[in-house]
């Protein structure tokens, strides 16, 4: 690194002072404020952590801005004056209670380099009476700011979330807090405070130097911010089952340090260290005398205020192998800096056999929390490999904010915590990876006034006591899903690039590898068992079979069944029907592709937890929810989907991972009870239902009438779609056992499925034994017959587009001449149970 071509912290200070010297002398009668500031465009995230302990103010507010040719007219409302987060943008504009805005005019701007610029602007009061005429021109931002103010200078670290325009009739505030792609835009500003007299440059320089030392943890003369870093060493996971096939030629093993990556250039002018957790370079004095520079990549830890640098790779000068790199560092880079010591590690190898290296790893791994690195000593074009006892992964997490509350903190029975959504990276897009709880303790604090989280004692090995991150950040997780610590370097990458943690496929590979023990990699039987486990997904009815086609043809049966479900859900979500004004909390069992998501939206529920054993159906449902939620996002209910079956003894604990306490007002079990309701599952199913259903809660069930099915003597075929060929236009039902039928609908199913026969007497008896009372029971044909007059007449008056289309579909479905729909509808039944 050539320091002569890079701006130092002192250069930024001088640029700011130089601009300030050009500002006119203050006039006491002048109502105009002269603002001179230095702005870092993509500041290191760590600077928030260094600034916060000395903050003179911390706050969040909504900023309203109208911009026109270098002029900004601004107003703001402190977030403490806004109740709840579900206000639409237009409502936020209506909350403005001051017609006196601030007019900011840009006089001069100079971009110093890619990371910083200086600006001189004037500020004055501006009476803006008719601002509501310019709603579409008003830009709204949520601003979180931490400020340190000294005599002549203020330092502001800001996170800005773009909310959209003032004309938008949607709640962007809640959306940006909850959506992973709505990232905060950070900035770091050093502003000179206007006084009645011009401040002398020496005083300013002294204050700015002190502030730079505070913020960047080094003298400004030794700070270089404009650095583009690319990791020179690629290290990838070596799957344990690949160990027996790895090339042993020149293969060596060394331990991995729990430090931070550092790219170092050593010259006779100084040692330049780019720290990955800081994302900038610090220069250190050196006694190194050679005219040839040395560049290396290593891992750094801090002990007694001295950096210990462990060599990973020598970049320049180039030598023939890794052992010569090690020798070079040992000979040339010893005792050249008081603040830094260069070290090398012991290399184990070479290996004569795979069993030898496996024996070594079996001994090493339990005592190495960060794992080991395998590398080839010759300079072949291959990455390094890592193996860990605990395959940690990096995920983007987003704290969850709820519909009405401005506080995400949840007060549990024995703990206080934040709930978060976890994401992995799917080719630059966030992929939902479940939810979790972040426990609030003395070492983890939620900073509610600036929407940030402070972690203590997680980076002590590198000399940092406190780390502060926004409510959206990248964190390291253990193989069991426990949050270990925030990743500062990866959070920097998330904020400024399209990065959401490890790629999803990499996460899956890490988790699968975790199930293999290092000592089992030569045992073919155990590896075979693991492979069989992945091939046979335990949650599917038959792991080798896909039961449903991707292209389903919806006919009259599907449309009319959907009508029945719509009535059922609307009725039991109604606040007036049950005289209950509270929004319902819903548990949906075997929810499938999520065809009823929209019904519950119109039912105005507060939350829905869905379960299903089929991960493919879960994926399609989540896609559907995200699509529905992309329009009026913040008004959609909270939704979680977990892969689980009601037949499992772990069902309740799995649900509790996302629904921490309380019980459900509604349990939705549509067209699926016939896969689980059998004597061998009664106890488990009913215990799960009892545990999760609130007193007075309702269980909504739709299924086929077992009493009618039990009377079948041979295969019965119903024509259900007159527009399809005869090979696809039917649904067949065949009794194959006293308690089982075989159902096949070729228009939507790839093969027949077995279902249990659910008889009314058995259903009501078992439910009654567990405290559930049958309060409603009706066949589909009865509901449709009662609804025909309404569908064919009164519903034609409906004008709302979506509802109008809904009834038009049902009117067409009722014209099902030439089919057996009426007969088939007799076989479908609704049960509603209420918990005593």
From Swiss-Prot:
Cofactor(s) required, per the database record: Mg(2+)
Quaternary organization: Heterodimer of a catalytic and a regulatory subunit. Intrinsic methyltransferase activity of the catalytic subunit is weak and needs to be stimulated 30- to 50-fold by the regulatory subunit, which is itself catalytically inert.
Catalytic activity line of the entry: a 5'-end triphospho-ribonucleoside in mRNA + H2O = a 5'-end diphospho-ribonucleoside in mRNA + phosphate + H(+); a 5'-end diphospho-ribonucleoside in mRNA + GTP + H(+) = a 5'-end (5'-triphosphoguanosine)-ribonucleoside in mRNA + diphosphate; a 5'-end (5'-triphosphoguanosine)-ribonucleoside in mRNA + S-adenosyl-L-methionine = a 5'-end (N(7)-methyl 5'-triphosphoguanosine)-ribonucleoside in mRNA + S-adenosyl-L-homocysteine
UniProtKB keywords: Hydrolase, Magnesium, Metal-binding, Methyltransferase, mRNA capping, mRNA processing, Multifunctional enzyme, Nucleotidyltransferase, RNA-binding, S-adenosyl-L-methionine, Transferase, Virion
InterPro entries given in the database record: MCEL_GT_NTPase, MCEL_GT_OB, MCEL_NTPase_sf, MCEL_OB_dom_sf, MCEL_TPase, MCEL_TPase_sf, mRNA_G-N7_MeTrfase_dom, RG7MT1
Protein known as: mRNA-capping enzyme catalytic subunit
Segments forming domain mRNA cap 0 methyltransferase: 552-836
EC number(s) per entry: 3.6.1.74, 2.7.7.50, 2.1.1.56
Annotated positions binding S-adenosyl-L-methionine: 541-542, 565, 590, 612, 670-672
Record remark: domains: The N-terminus contains the triphosphatase and guanylyltransferase domains, whereas the C-terminus contains the methyltransferase domain. The N-terminus is involved in binding to the termination motif 5'-UUUUUNU-3' in the nascent mRNA.
Subcellular localization: Virion
Keyword check for S-adenosyl-L-methionine: yes
UniProt site positions, description: Essential for RNA triphosphatase activity: 74, 104, 123, 156, 158
Family: In the N-terminal section; belongs to the dsDNA virus mRNA guanylyltransferase family.
Taxonomic path: Viruses, Varidnaviria, Bamfordvirae, Nucleocytoviricota, Pokkesviricetes
Gene Ontology cellular component annotations, sorted alphabetically: virion component
UniProt-annotated binding residues for Mg(2+): 35, 37, 189, 191
Residue span of region Triphosphatase-guanylyltransferase: 1-532
Organism: Rabbit fibroma virus (strain Kasza)
Annotated mRNA binding sites: 561-562
Site location (mRNA cap binding): 599, 624, 674, 755, 828
Function of the protein: Catalytic subunit of the mRNA capping enzyme which catalyzes three enzymatic reactions: the 5' triphosphate end of the pre-mRNA is hydrolyzed to a diphosphate by RNA 5' triphosphatase; the diphosphate RNA end is capped with GMP by RNA guanylyltransferase and the GpppN cap is methylated by RNA (guanine-N7) methyltransferase. The heterodimeric enzyme is also involved in early viral gene transcription termination and intermediate viral gene transcription initiation. Early gene transcription termination requires the termination factor VTF, the DNA-dependent ATPase NPH-I and the Rap94 subunit of the viral RNA polymerase, as well as the presence of a specific termination motif. Binds, together with RAP94, to the termination motif 5'-UUUUUNU-3' in the nascent early mRNA.
Catalytic residue positions: 256 (n6-gmp-lysine intermediate)
Molecular function in Gene Ontology: inorganic triphosphate phosphatase activity; metal ion binding; mRNA 5'-cap (guanine-N7-)-methyltransferase activity; mRNA 5'-triphosphate monophosphatase activity; mRNA guanylyltransferase activity; polynucleotide 5'-phosphatase activity; RNA binding
């Amino acid at each position: 690194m050539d320091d002569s071509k890079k701006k130092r912290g002192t250069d930024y200070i001088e640029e700011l002072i130089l601009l300030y010297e050009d500002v006119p002398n203050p006039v006491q009668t002048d109502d105009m404020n002269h603002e001179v500031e230095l702005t870092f465009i993509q500041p290191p995230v760590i600077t928030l952590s260094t600034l916060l302990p000395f903050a003179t103010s911390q706050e969040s507010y909504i900023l309203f801005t109208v911009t026109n040719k270098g002029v900004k007219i601004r107003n703001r409302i402190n977030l403490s004056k806004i109740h709840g987060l579900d206000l639409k943008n237009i409502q936020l504009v209506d909350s403005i209670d001051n017609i006196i805005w601030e007019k900011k005019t840009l006089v001069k701007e100079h971009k110093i380099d890619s990371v910083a610029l200086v600006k001189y602007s004037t500020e004055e009061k501006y009476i803006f009476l008719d601002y509501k005429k310019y709603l579409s021109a008003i830009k709204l931002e949520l601003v979180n700011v931490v400020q340190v103010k000294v005599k002549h200078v203020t330092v502001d670290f800001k996170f800005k979330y773009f909310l959209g325009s003032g004309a938008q009739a949607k709640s962007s505030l809640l959306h940006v807090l909850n959506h992973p792609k709505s990232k905060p835009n950070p900035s770091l500003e050093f502003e000179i405070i206007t006084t009645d007299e011009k401040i002398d440059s020496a005083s300013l320089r002294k204050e700015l130097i002190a502030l730079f030392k505070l913020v960047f943890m080094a003298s400004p003369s030794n700070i270089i911010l404009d650095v583009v870093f690319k990791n020179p060493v690629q290290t990838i996971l070596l799957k344990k089952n690949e160990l027996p096939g790895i090339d042993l030629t020149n293969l060596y093993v060394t331990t991995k340090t729990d430090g931070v990556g550092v790219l170092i250039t050593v010259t006779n002018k100084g040692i330049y260290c780019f720290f990955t957790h800081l994302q900038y370079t610090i220069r250190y004095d050196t006694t190194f005398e050679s005219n040839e520079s040395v560049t290396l990549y290593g891992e750094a830890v801090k002990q007694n205020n001295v950096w210990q640098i462990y060599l990973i790779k020598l970049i320049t000068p180039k030598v023939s192998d890794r052992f010569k790199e090690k020798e070079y560092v040992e000979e040339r880079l010893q005792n050249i800096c008081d603040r830094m010591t260069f070290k090398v590690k012991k290399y184990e190898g070479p290996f004569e056999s795979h069993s030898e290296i496996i024996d070594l790893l079996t001994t090493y791994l339990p005592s190495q929390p960060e794992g080991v690195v395998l590398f080839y000593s010759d300079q072949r074009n291959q990455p390094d490999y890592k193996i860990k006892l605990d395959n940690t992964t990096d995920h983007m997490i987003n704290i969850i904010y709820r519909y009405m509350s401005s506080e995400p903190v949840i007060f549990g029975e024995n703990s206080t915590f934040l709930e978060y959504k976890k994401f992995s990276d799917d080719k630059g897009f966030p992929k939902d990876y479940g939810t979790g709880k972040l426990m609030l303790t003395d070492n983890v604090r939620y900073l509610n006034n600036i929407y940030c989280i402070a972690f203590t004692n997680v980076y002590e090995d590198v000399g940092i006591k406190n780390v502060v991150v926004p409510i959206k950040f990248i964190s390291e997780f253990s193989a069991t899903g426990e949050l270990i610590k925030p990743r500062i370097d990866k959070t920097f990458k998330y904020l400024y690039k399209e990065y959401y943690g490890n790629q999803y496929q990499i996460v899956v590979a890490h988790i699968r590898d975790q199930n293999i023990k290092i000592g089992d990699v030569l045992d073919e039987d155990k590896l075979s068992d693991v492979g069989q486990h992945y091939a046979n997904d335990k949650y599917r009815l038959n792991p080798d079979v896909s039961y449903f086609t991707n292209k389903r043809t919806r006919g009259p049966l599907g449309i009319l069944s959907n009508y029945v479900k719509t009535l059922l859900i609307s009725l039991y979500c109604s606040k007036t029907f049950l005289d209950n004004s509270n929004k319902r909390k819903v548990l949906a069992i075997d929810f499938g592709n999520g065809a009823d998501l929209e019904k519950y939206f119109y039912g105005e529920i507060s939350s829905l937890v869905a379960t299903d054993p089929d991960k493919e159906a879960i994926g399609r449902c989540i896609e559907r929810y995200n699509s529905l939620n992309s329009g009026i996002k913040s008004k959609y209910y909270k939704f979680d989907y977990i892969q689980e079956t009601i037949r499992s003894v772990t069902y309740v604990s799995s649900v509790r991972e996302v629904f921490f306490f309380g019980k459900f007002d509604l349990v939705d079990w549509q067209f699926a009870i016939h896969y689980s309701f059998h004597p061998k599952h009664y106890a488990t199913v009913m215990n799960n239902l009892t545990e999760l259903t609130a007193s007075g809660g309702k269980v909504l069930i739709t299924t086929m009438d077992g009493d009618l099915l039990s009377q079948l003597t041979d295969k019965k075929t119903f024509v259900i779609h007159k527009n399809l060929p005869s090979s696809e236009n039917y649904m067949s039902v065949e009794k194959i056992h006293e308690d089982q039928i075989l159902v096949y609908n070729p228009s939507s199913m790839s093969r027949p499925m077995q279902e249990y026969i659910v008889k009314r007497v058995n259903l009501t008896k078992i439910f009654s034994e567990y405290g559930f009372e049958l309060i409603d029971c009706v066949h589909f044909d009865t509901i449709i017959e009662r609804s025909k007059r309404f569908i064919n007449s009164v519903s034609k008056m409906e004008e709302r587009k979506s509802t109008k289309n809904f009834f038009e579909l049902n009117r067409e479905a009722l014209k099902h001449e030439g089919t057996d729909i009426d007969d088939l509808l007799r076989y479908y039944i609704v049960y509603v149970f209420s918990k005593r």
